[in-house]
């Protein structure tokens, strides 16, 4: 007799198939064994709930049972009843049976009258043998591989046992028969238990109800959810373009539909009960009912595979039963104002239930602006502000006309004001980025123009600099949506936000990124993807193509789980992705190739970004790709490679290639110039000449290769004459020659020229510690740019090998140096006598070049207790005046920063009168030395040289307006990245 031990957990390879429903209770196992005359192996003290598997005979074949199951389903659809021999498929776990047969009784193979299944049916193992742990494993696999002594190796265990469980899964997916009254009652008890759990968790109104049984909700479902983790669920398991497995098996599709049908019926009943509670009108009952619906919808959005279909079906059910309309009326009703919690709970349900169909209902019923007005009034608490932004973002996902009508209100100002005053609330910042992304995707040219006037590109820089990945991601999508419009590209470039896009994409995996937000983890709608599709066009900026390709890879991973990959063919994304995948854009091509692999499409030929190394075949492919297929043979005949392609002139195209049409030549040269700017010359450019020309003006990069082939490097630039530029370097445009000439007027050394050019682009350099000061530094940058200052902040990567000099040149070029001091920002420079820390290097450079240093102190910052730990060359910073930053009074803080910049407050070098009165122990002690404040009328005059925290009554002088009016127009500010953590 075998010991009564439970079998081990199945291997992960078939865990998603058996769904934990493949083990049978004792009674069911015995009845199945009796129905097929199979011997059983009961344990000595077996109980009803013990898990045990019947021992199968040598001639037993699971393919036969699988085929019988399919025949039973067909008969059921045709109105026929199955025979009693098919009891294997009709039994429930709760069926009561008599005592089992004796284990040693003779066994006859089951007689099956139906024909055998086709050869395409999955192979099944035979001759299982019991092991010491109570499991049954086959001694001979279907391929004839023998297993000595009935033992199975780990390598074979997954294959063989998964086949058994797959067969059992198909058995469990048959349409359930009408059970007995007792069974129906048991099912009702299960639903009641789950309903009570929703009602009791996290709600005070239902505290008097009996507590629900402590059972995980997944255990109450007829078909359990997959037990794989969220991370594993989104991993791309396909890294080859050969026969990609993009389609679900029939078993998985049946399981998915069964799960959807079962859960939908159960959740609809729970919705009805929740709204019965809401119908009682009392505030406590309304809150209780809304809490149940909200938690239910939150669970639905987290359901694997079927979440989108299940959620949309429940949203339709709410609308069809007038529940959705009732929620809207309670949310916008003036009577609800008496109880903010009722309005909040109604709003949270609307947040989860605003599907495309329900949004159409809102628009048709003219509820849009009413909901918008009420949502904008939710601004008292962080939870209200989060809900406000979430509802606003959902309302924009309808059409251009609706979006434009909403933009004409103060909604953009409301969004900016909400997240501007909550920089330390990740949820608010996340929903702000989501709202702006939806607004920009669902609005027309006129709407985008109005948004640009609100300085949204600058604010997107702040959102794209946050620690939360979802916030950064949707901020990148939003800014790329704006820059896709050619007319807005110059304005967006000035904000520096575009420089944050590709560095973010390069360190993230689209396959695992979607899980970070429950509602967006199941993908966006077809209409949303259609609006993103134009960003893949070759005429768009490189960053826009990269973020679009990233998102389509993310969506492909999700849609594959949902078996909805056809949507990409329907919207025409396949061809667009193939074009991007074959382009020289490294980041965009990488993600486009991944998307095509997941979808199951062939990845096209990939061109390298190192154009000088292209072969003749590469050039011919590129010529065909840009639309000049009729000239491919001419390029092949002339054996044009990457080197010759970069040196082609209009005369070469006309006489050697035979491109007679002048318009054809112009269009070809336009594509060639774009290629020259995007090309990577690092293999032939040792002096970083291309980087220098790009820093002066991106359009000068088209001359890089011809200058390199003629032996020009950075050290020779100052010696070039106008004639040499025109003849040797090929700079035929006189304006371009003038730009280079002006760059060398103030200095002859290339480094001095670079500083001189940077001084025309930078007013303020911001130094900060990335680990703690990133958010505050990015906020200060945006606020300064809005006041007309050109700001440098090190957020982008510098070229390898030139990091030190390039960063310090920006400090030399700037007139003002802002040091953002946040908690622990000086810890890494303590006792740094070798000047290895980057904040130390930056501050030392600012002192050496006598910059106007302005410290900005976070409220939690404190100077080190021992002053001698700070290196001597920067120790003077402890005696500098500065601004204490308080987020509630940002305008007052920034006004004081402007006064430091304009010189109205004392300059950076401390006076001898100030030094004796300075105590250097902590910032808090320094602030305790308050100054005398005299009030005259509504204004304040602040005396004394020490720092004072800004207050709501602080009134800045008119210097800000005077300074802004005299400043030059905002210019794009350079940026870089350093190891500042």
From Swiss-Prot:
Residues 182-200 have a biased composition (Basic and acidic residues). Residues 1-31, 74-128, 173-225, 908-981 are annotated as: Disordered. Residues 87-97 have a biased composition (Acidic residues). Highly expressed in hypodermis. Localizes to postsynaptic regions of axons. Residues 115-128 have a biased composition (Pro residues). This is NAD(+) hydrolase tir-1. Residues 614-678, 684-750 form the SAM domain. The SAM domains mediate the localization to postsynaptic regions of neurons. The TIR domain mediates NAD(+) hydrolase (NADase) activity. Self-association of TIR domains is required for NADase activity. Belongs to the SARM1 family. GO terms for cellular component: axon; axon cytoplasm; cell body; cytoplasm; dendrite. Residues 98-114 have a biased composition (Low complexity). NAD(+) hydrolase, which plays a key role in non-apoptotic cell death by regulating NAD(+) metabolism. In response to stress, homooligomerizes and catalyzes cleavage of NAD(+) into ADP-D-ribose (ADPR) and nicotinamide; NAD(+) cleavage promoting non-apoptotic neuronal cell death. In males, involved in non-apoptotic death of the linker cell which guides gonad elongation during larval development. Required for both innate immune response and specification of AWC(OFF) neuron. It comes from Caenorhabditis elegans.
């Amino acid at each position: 007799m075998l010991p009564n031990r439970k079998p081990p957990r199945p291997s992960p390879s078939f865990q998603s198939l058996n769904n934990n429903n493949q083990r049978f209770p004792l009674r069911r196992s015995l009845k199945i064994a009796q129905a097929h005359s199979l011997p059983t192996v009961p344990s000595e003290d077996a109980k009803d709930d013990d898990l045990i598997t019947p021992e199968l005979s040598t001639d037993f074949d699971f393919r036969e049972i699988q085929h019988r199951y399919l025949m039973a389903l067909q008969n059921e659809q045709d109105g026929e009843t199955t025979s009693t021999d098919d009891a294997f498929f009709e039994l429930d776990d709760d069926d009561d049976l008599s005592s089992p047969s004796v284990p040693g009784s003779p066994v006859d193979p089951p007689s099956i009258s139906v024909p055998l299944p086709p050869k395409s049916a999955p192979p099944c193992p035979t001759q299982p043998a019991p092991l010491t742990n109570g499991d049954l494993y086959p001694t001979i696999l279907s391929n004839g591989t023998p297993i000595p002594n009935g033992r199975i190796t780990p390598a074979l265990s997954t294959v063989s046992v998964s086949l058994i469980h797959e067969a059992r899964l198909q058995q469990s997916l048959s349409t359930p028969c009408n059970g007995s009254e007792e069974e129906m009652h048991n099912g009702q008890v299960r639903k009641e238990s789950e309903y009570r759990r929703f009602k009791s968790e996290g709600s005070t109104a239902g505290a008097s109800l009996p507590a629900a049984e402590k059972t995980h909700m997944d255990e109450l479902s007829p078909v359990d959810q997959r037990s794989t983790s969220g991370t594993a669920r989104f991993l791309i398991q396909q890294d080859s373009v050969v026969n990609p497995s993009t389609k679900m098996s029939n078993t998985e599709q049946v399981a998915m539909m069964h799960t959807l049908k079962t859960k939908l019926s159960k959740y609809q009943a729970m919705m009805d009960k929740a709204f019965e509670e809401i119908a009682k009108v009392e505030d406590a009952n309304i809150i209780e009912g809304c809490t149940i619906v909200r938690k239910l919808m939150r669970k639905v959005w987290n359901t694997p595979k079927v979440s989108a279909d299940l959620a949309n079906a429940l949203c339709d059910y709410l609308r069809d039963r007038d529940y959705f309309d009732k929620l809207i009326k309670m949310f916008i009703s003036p009577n609800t104002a008496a109880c903010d919690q009722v309005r909040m709970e109604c709003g949270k349900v609307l947040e989860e239930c605003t599907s495309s169909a329900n949004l159409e209902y809102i628009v048709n019923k003219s509820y849009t602006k009413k909901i918008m007005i009420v949502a904008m009034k939710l601004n008292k608490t962080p939870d209200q502000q989060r809900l406000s932004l979430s509802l606003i973002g959902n309302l924009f996902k309808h059409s251009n006309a609706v979006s434009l009508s909403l933009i004409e209100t103060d909604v953009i100002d409301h969004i900016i004001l909400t997240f501007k005053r909550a920089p330390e609330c990740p949820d608010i910042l996340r929903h702000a980025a989501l709202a702006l992304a939806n607004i920009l995707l669902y609005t027309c040219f006129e709407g985008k123009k109005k948004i640009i006037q609100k300085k949204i590109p600058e604010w997107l820089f702040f959102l794209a600099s946050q620690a939360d990945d979802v916030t950064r991601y949707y901020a990148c999508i939003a800014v790329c949506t704006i820059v896709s419009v050619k007319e807005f590209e110059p304005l967006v470039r000035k904000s520096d936000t575009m420089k944050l896009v590709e560095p973010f994409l390069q360190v993230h995996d689209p396959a695992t990124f979607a899980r970070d937000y429950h509602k967006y983890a199941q993908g966006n709608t077809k209409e949303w993807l259609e609006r993103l599709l134009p960003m893949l066009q070759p005429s768009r900026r490189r960053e826009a193509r990269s973020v679009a390709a990233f998102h389509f890879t993310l969506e492909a991973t999700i849609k594959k789980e949902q078996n909805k990959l056809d949507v990409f063919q329907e919207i025409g994304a396949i061809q667009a992705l193939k074009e991007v995948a074959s382009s020289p854009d490294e980041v965009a091509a990488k993600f486009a190739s991944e998307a095509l692999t997941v979808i199951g499409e062939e990845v096209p030929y990939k061109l390298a970004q190192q154009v000088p190394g292209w072969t003749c075949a590469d050039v011919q492919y590129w010529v065909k790709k840009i639309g000049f297929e009729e000239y491919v043979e001419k390029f092949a005949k002339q054996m044009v490679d990457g080197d010759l392609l970069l040196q082609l002139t209009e005369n070469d195209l006309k006489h050697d290639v035979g491109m007679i049409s002048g318009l054809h030549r112009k269009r070809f040269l336009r594509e060639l110039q774009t290629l020259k700017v995007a090309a990577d010359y690092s293999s032939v450019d040792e002096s970083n000449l291309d980087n220098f020309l790009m820093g002066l003006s991106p359009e000068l990069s088209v001359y890089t290769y011809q200058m390199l082939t003629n032996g020009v490097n950075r050290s020779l630039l100052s010696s070039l004459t106008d004639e040499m530029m025109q003849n040797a370097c090929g700079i035929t445009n006189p304006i371009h020659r003038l730009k280079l000439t002006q760059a060398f007027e103030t200095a002859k050394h290339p480094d001095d020229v670079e500083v001189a050019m940077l001084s025309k682009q930078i007013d303020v350099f911001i130094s900060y510690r990335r680990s703690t000061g990133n958010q505050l530094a990015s906020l200060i940058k945006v606020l300064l740019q809005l006041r007309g200052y050109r700001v440098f902040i090190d957020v982008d990567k510098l070229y390898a090998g030139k990091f030190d000099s390039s960063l310090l040149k920006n400090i030399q070029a700037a007139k003002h140096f802002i040091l953002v001091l946040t908690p622990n920002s000086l810890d890494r420079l303590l006792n740094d006598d070798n000047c290895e820390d980057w904040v130390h290097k930056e501050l030392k450079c600012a002192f050496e070049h006598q910059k106007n240093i302005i410290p900005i102190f976070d409220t939690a910052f404190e100077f080190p207790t021992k002053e001698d730990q700070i290196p001597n060359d920067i120790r003077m910073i402890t005696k500098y005046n500065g601004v204490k930053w308080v987020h509630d009074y940002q305008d007052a803080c920034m006004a004081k920063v402007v006064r430091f910049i304009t010189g109205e407050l004392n300059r950076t070098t401390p006076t001898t009168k100030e030094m004796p009165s300075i105590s250097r122990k902590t910032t808090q002690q320094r602030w305790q030395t308050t100054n005398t404040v005299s009030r005259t009328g509504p204004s304040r005059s602040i005396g004394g040289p020490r720092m004072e925290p800004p207050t709501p009554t602080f009134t800045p002088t008119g210097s800000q307006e005077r300074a802004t009016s005299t400043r030059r127009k905002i210019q794009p500010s350079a940026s870089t990245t350093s190891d500042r953590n």
